[in-house]
Amino acid sequence: MASASSSRAGVALPFEKSQLTLKVVSAKPKVHNRQPRINSYVEVAVDGLPSETKKTGKRIGSSELLWNEIIVLNVTAQSHLDLKVWSCHTLRNELLGTASVNLSNVLKNNGGKMENTQLTLNLQTENKGSVVSGGELTIFLDGPTVDLGSVPNGSAVTDGSQPPSRESSGTAIAPETRHQPPSTNCFGGRSRTHRHSGGSARTATAASEQSPGARNRHRQPVKNSSSSGLANGTVNEEPTPASEPEESSVVGVTSLPAAALSVSSNPNTTSLPAQSTPAEGEEASTSGTQQLPAAAQAPDALPAGWEQRELPNGRVYYVDHNTKTTTWERPLPPGWEKRTDPRGRFYYVDHNTRTTTWQRPTAEYVRNYEQWQSQRNQLQGAMQHFSQRFLYQSSSASTDHDPLGPLPPGWEKRQDNGRVYYVNHNTRTTQWEDPRTQGMIQEPALPPGWEMKYTSEGVRYFVDHNTRTTTFKDPRPGFESGTKQGSPGAYDRSFRWKYHQFRFLCHSNALPSHVKISVSRQTLFEDSFQQIMNMKPYDLRRRLYIIMRGEEGLDYGGIAREWFFLLSHEVLNPMYCLFEYAGKNNYCLQINPASSINPDHLTYFRFIGRFIAMALYHGKFIDTGFTLPFYKRMLNKRPTLKDLESIDPEFYNSIVWIKENNLEECGLELFFIQDMEILGKVTTHELKEGGENIRVTEENKEEYIMLLTDWRFTRGVEEQTKAFLDGFNEVAPLEWLRYFDEKELELMLCGMQEIDMSDWQKNAIYRHYTKSSKQIQWFWQVVKEMDNEKRIRLLQFVTGTCRLPVGGFAELIGSNGPQKFCIDRVGKETWLPRSHTCFNRLDLPPYKSYEQLKEKLLYAIEETEGFGQE
């Protein structure tokens, strides 16, 4: 009988995966009480493998959805395809229906061929606990031709892979055998434990296959048509015990030849090789057998608990007695581990050397690596001395002859083009000034009790031992502004210094190229969420290039500013239940404890954390800010009782009353517990362990107030805050904000909203106009007559955002750095004013009258939307 592994030309090999081309044509879902037009896609999974799960693009339709999209999959003839039709919504995806395809049934129904086979699948969905019809899905399958003779048909298996059975005197075969070797499938004779390209290993066997490895200590007779010449030979050896698997191993995973497998005509005779292999030059005590090859005579030892076995067709597999599993692949050397990366690719971890590799390690590979490592260690010391042969003498000489002594820790002196400069490895910055003399030459002494110190980053500060306080401000007269030092002095200069330090960190960690984000104004939230979360966090540090679908604007910074403004207004909208207003009269935002009503709320908080970090990293403003206690949480600072007054005045007044009154005289029975209600569910929280049994007294009242204040700021929002900070930290490390306080962080994120008209006029420039032009005078007259809301709309119309930098209009940022507000004479009097948000420029036509200019300007800022190109 032909072996199952035989193949013909044009027929898929039975033991290899093949490519299947699946064309998703259309779907007719049954839509009940939903929107008439739905946005959906199809997800296809092969055998439930994440690496073989692919999706189609999104399509919008009503009664019928058309894709006509081709997906290429790696399958076997016994694979199962799971197809799911999803409907996309803003906050979640909804399953419209599922269907499954058994490829073995399709092959049998079509004579082993799949040539543009059309299938109309019935979608099923769940409705109130019952499975109902969800419509139809039409697909085409185009795959290889398969020999149906190699496909297991239930109870029968091919002769070439007939498994042995246990002896009648042995233990009965259980449904799950002790050692189940890899099984055969219709693409031929391999179990799902062998490696697939881009996939993961599976140990499940088909229901129609029996275990050829269900042997414990007694081996069974095996018939093999390919070994008929050895039918009269017998092996008079003892069976191999399970505790000695290393004596029957072979090198690698290469199958033994037919001569290594002796078959007896006696059913009770052991037929597989046992305890040991013949030594070199020694003949085995069998009749009709041949000597084993050299590779099998000098085997590498298997790990403890492993055993090598052989199928009747000569194929070798390995039994792990520790986990009671089998595999085709030889076990890894000690200290190695097999893992899968997010793309489904296998790699191998060497815990001995803490390294990884794509190549599967073998005994020879490990020996070669150890030999190379030994040679490398011998040469490493010599190479290190060789590379530092000049550095040691020069450094010692410079130290000996330098009157200022050694540099501070973390500093290095270098020379470029004849000029000396200094490198601060603590902050990864360079400077021309010598840190040993900077700020010390010709400076008066500090006042009594004061001391100058430096942080680990090289920033100096001053310690007042009289009051036990520290400050960045120089206490010496004439040094308040820090003009001689360059370090932060007074508060206004201190914030500028902190801001420039932060911008320096952002620029020094920026990545080249740009990242494109394509969104639609109608689905801004969903589009931005999908694209930002699908990107690597470090890619979000690249220069942003925002594309508004249907608009032809080129983003040189202006579209990005508007995108940050619009998206922040959308994601921080309390209607999504992710955030809530801090109070009735306080429109700052805080995390909503009831956000868990959305099952994916933690993913959205992670997205918002990334978005806020992007705004700070790229120097853009958002529309609405958070509460000051939330900024303190970002800075890892502890909120105080005074911070509670702005977000919950009633709770604050209650705590103040407790603090100012004697609880024992009032007869209040308070304990270290507090109740909280979320979505109608009341839960009790202990402020400290065993708090329900600890009564609040005058002695422990301060501790109670402190714990109660901390609980009020964190109640019900611990998970949400952690997800937000994790997302933020992925883009910009929170350590970069350590110099700021909560008010400075709010100012840097939200900017200033109050508009100073004199500052605006003072820092405006004109093109093809002059300051005395009548159109310019009319323009400023219109702006002065506007209220603050319309002025903000005008500012947003021209710059893309309604917020101002800390320095006001003098520090407006354009595409290439600072760019002031500009008014240009462009167009005819019938045109509307236009803006170039990337350059902070307003195109103002030469209108004939004040009324005409006012009408056109107000119409432009209130009724226009979108970008275009001239």
UniProtKB/Swiss-Prot annotation:
Name of the protein in its database record: NEDD4-like E3 ubiquitin-protein ligase WWP2
Post-translational modification: Autoubiquitinated. Ubiquitinated by the SCF(FBXL15) complex, leading to its degradation by the proteasome.
Organism expressing this protein natively: Mus musculus
Pfam families linked to this entry: HECT (PF00632), WW (PF00397)
Catalytic activity as recorded in UniProt: S-ubiquitinyl-[E2 ubiquitin-conjugating enzyme]-L-cysteine + [acceptor protein]-L-lysine = [E2 ubiquitin-conjugating enzyme]-L-cysteine + N(6)-ubiquitinyl-[acceptor protein]-L-lysine
A GO term for molecular function: transmembrane transporter binding
Something else known: A cysteine residue is required for ubiquitin-thioester formation.
Regulation of its activity: Activated by NDFIP1- and NDFIP2-binding.
SUPFAM superfamilies from the UniProt entry: C2 domain (Calcium/lipid-binding domain, CaLB), Hect, E3 ligase catalytic domain, WW domain
Subcellular location: Nucleus
PANTHER family on file: HECT DOMAIN UBIQUITIN-PROTEIN LIGASE (PTHR11254), NEDD4-LIKE E3 UBIQUITIN-PROTEIN LIGASE WWP2 (PTHR11254:SF396)
WW domain boundaries: 300-333, 330-363, 405-437, 444-477
Self-association and partners: Interacts with SCNN1A, SCNN1B, SCNN1G, WBP1, WBP2 and ATN1. Interacts with ERBB4, NDFIP1 and NDFIP2. Interacts with ARRDC4. Interacts with POU5F1, RBP1, EGR2 and SLC11A2. Interacts (via WW domains) with ARRDC1 (via PPxY motifs); ubiquitinates ARRDC1. Interacts (via WW domains) with ARRDC2 and ARRDC3.
Record-listed Phosphoserine modification sites: 211
All copies of domain HECT, residue ranges: 536-870
Function: E3 ubiquitin-protein ligase which accepts ubiquitin from an E2 ubiquitin-conjugating enzyme in the form of a thioester and then directly transfers the ubiquitin to targeted substrates. Polyubiquitinates POU5F1 by 'Lys-63'-linked conjugation and promotes it to proteasomal degradation; regulates POU5F1 protein level during differentiation of embryonal carcinoma cells (ECCs) but not in undifferentiated ECCs and embryonic stem cells (ESCs). Ubiquitinates EGR2 and promotes it to proteasomal degradation; in T-cells the ubiquitination inhibits activation-induced cell death.
Presence of keyword Repeat: yes
Residue ranges with Polar residues bias: 152-171, 222-235, 262-289
Pathway entry: Protein modification; protein ubiquitination
GO BP of this protein: extracellular transport; negative regulation of DNA-templated transcription; negative regulation of gene expression; negative regulation of potassium ion export across plasma membrane; negative regulation of protein transport; negative regulation of transcription by RNA polymerase II; positive regulation of transcription by RNA polymerase II; proteasome-mediated ubiquitin-dependent protein catabolic process
E.C. no: 2.3.2.26
Segments of skewed composition (Low complexity): 198-208, 290-300
Keywords noted in UniProt: Nucleus, Phosphoprotein, Repeat, Transferase, Ubl conjugation, Ubl conjugation pathway
Gene3D superfamilies xrefs: 2.20.70.10, C2 domain, Hect, E3 ligase catalytic domain, Hect, E3 ligase catalytic domains
Region Disordered: start-end pairs: 150-300
Domain writeup: The C2 domain is involved in autoinhibition of the catalytic activity by interacting with the HECT domain.
